[in-house]
Amino acid sequence: CRERKPLGLLFLGGNPEFFKQGFAKVDVPSVLVTNRANNLPFENLSSVATDDIAAGKCAVDALFEAGHDKIGIIGGDPVKSYTSHQRYLGCKESFAEHGKEMNLEVCYEKARFSFDSAYRAMKRLVEKYPDLTAVFAMSDVMAIGAIRALRDMDYRVPEDISVIGFDGTVLAEYYNPKLATIRQQYPVSYTHLTLPTI
């Protein structure tokens, strides 16, 4: 950065807590994309982010409202992944609002954000929670991996087990069955607001 003298920087993902440790050395306007910077004390740092707590809650609310009360979750490690932790908090909030306890040992299965990892996580989840009727996968990629595992175990989706993903990817639109998903949307106005900052 020092040799090229950039006019601005974009930071993608990561835990915002890490910015507290090293961002003070950055002296150009910067934007943190996918995580919030509102609790970070840097005047030259802005952010564009999804409210992952609200998104996690929205996904699980939709499953409860569809009549499900045995809901499993496939997500990243909420201790190690900031985004997974935020979505986990939203899930927990939804469970509480619907009078249910979210027992991590039973209904939550950790996976990497990949088809294969989610496939294996779905198999583990069904083994420990055989009467579940719905799953929230914390990404569309995870949801597709989970659906493949369910089909390989002779479950029908959504007739036997409903699955909802997160991201709203194009792949979700064209997947068969069409994937229910929570869509991340960054309005065009964010781009117009952010680019002049940099």
Predicted regions and their residues:
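Short acidic, glycine/proline-rich loop/turn micro-motifs
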Residues: F42-L45, G75, Y174-K178
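Hinge/beta->alpha junction and helix N-cap segments in small-molecule ligand-binding domains
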Residues: S47-C58, I74-F95, K100-A121, F136-I144, ...
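Alpha-helical recognition/docking segments in bacterial nutrient-uptake
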Residues: C1-D61, E65, E127, D131
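Short acidic capping loops at alpha-helix termini that bridge into adjacent secondary structure
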Residues: D69-K70, M102-V106, V157-V163
